[in-house]
Curated annotation (Swiss-Prot):
Cited PANTHER family: OVOINHIBITOR-RELATED, SERINE PROTEASE INHIBITOR
Keyword Secreted: yes
A GO CC term assigned to this protein in UniProt: extracellular region
Disulphides: C5-C44, C22-C41, C30-C62, C70-C109, C87-C106, C95-C127, C138-C168, C146-C165, C154-C186
GO molecular function, one term: serine-type endopeptidase inhibitor activity
Glycan attachment positions: N10, N53, N75, N175
Domain Kazal-like: 1-64, 65-129, 132-186
Site (Reactive bond 2 for trypsin): K89, D90
The protein's name in its UniProt record: Ovomucoid
InterPro entries found in the cross-reference section: Kazal_dom (IPR002350), Kazal_dom_sf (IPR036058), Prot_inh_Kazal-m (IPR001239)
Organism: Coturnix japonica (Japanese quail)
Amino acid sequence: VEVDCSRFPNTTNEEGKDEVVCPDELRLICGTDGVTYNHECMLCFYNKEYGTNISKEQDGECGETVPMDCSRYPNTTSEDGKVTILCTKDFSFVCGTDGVTYDNECMLCAHNVVQGTSVGKKHDGECRKELAAVSVDCSEYPKPACPKDYRPVCGSDNKTYSNKCNFCNAVVESNGTLTLNHFGKC
């Protein structure tokens, strides 16, 4: 669902860039990137700030996982005791909570058995790649002081940074090894 961002006011920030001004109220929505936003306005803010085109998937928080029953897939045990799940080659893509697209639910179950992991099913269909092309421009950083506004981003270190300024300062400090994981809290 496309969010009408024109209903939220804009202002010019200290860097001279247009910025969406959001109310403090909490009306959680789930974006098509699988991230929960505090308000439709915050989704508009991130789209403007980072040049993305994320839409609203639904009202309320994003669901963590969708139930899946791996016991329904046939399996075999080899002589050395290794269990293998037997999957078809059907393409009925599912997105794992690890951000990887699996050919079908059975292949996700098989991955967990082989790797000894417990990756859940985030949703049916391919994982969305909205964030794959998103990079944060930190060329104007580091800055000696950052504003106190709370517009969280999650870094590749699984740490929540309160805003772009704090995140970019950390990127510079990491010599560029820190990247954007997703918008919102980790």
